[in-house]
Amino acid sequence: FGFGFIEVGTIPPKSQLGNPKPRIFRLEKDKGMINRLGFNNDGIEVVSKRISDNFPNGVLGINIGPNKNTTNKLEDFIFCLTKIHEQADYITINISSPNTEGLRDFHHKDSMKDLLDKLNKLKKLKKIKKPLFIKLSPDIKDSEISDIVELIFKYNIDGIIISNTSDSTRERLTDSKKKEKG
């Protein structure tokens, strides 16, 4: 036995420290965790080299997202896909993190349409054949689900990854750390 695949990321274009520590909280009473990592890593260029130098054979997924302080999240996704697609067996487009302000706005129909349209055009232009997965929030509103599904089919997204940290289920928790952001 072993791992069927490995996914690395979320990797943004530029290096960033992520959120201040502590970033992970164990909720012992609730048998759960809260995280607020904030995509802490060395950025797409350094991670790409690290993958080239160190990754053995096997299935590799690469999860991409925008920098926390970017002025254009959409362009960050385009930049990362352009830089990393040759090294990945599949690419995950992470729009699920509650720890990157405004990232979950891509769940709204017009924003998701813009994102998927640009990614699709880039795939055609660069002849990218790698599967694209989209990582969704567990806090999607019922009213958004049909629009999201419609766009996923329209743009031939290959897979869906659910989920990430939820912001909406805290009222059931009993641990004293339940109010930590993440």
What residues fall within each predicted segment?
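A gly/proline- and charged-residue-enriched helix-loop-helix capping module
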Residues: 9-59
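Glycine/Thr-rich beta-alpha phosphate-binding loop at enzyme active sites
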Residues: 98-111, 151-182
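Active-site glycine- and acidic-residue-rich loops that bind
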Residues: 66-78, 105, 111, 133-153
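Active-site beta-loop-alpha junctions enriched in small/polar residues
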Residues: 11, 65-69, 96-98, 135-139, ...
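Glycine-rich, proline-tolerant flexible connector loops at the mouths of alpha/beta enzymes
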Residues: 10-21, 32-35, 89-109, 169-171
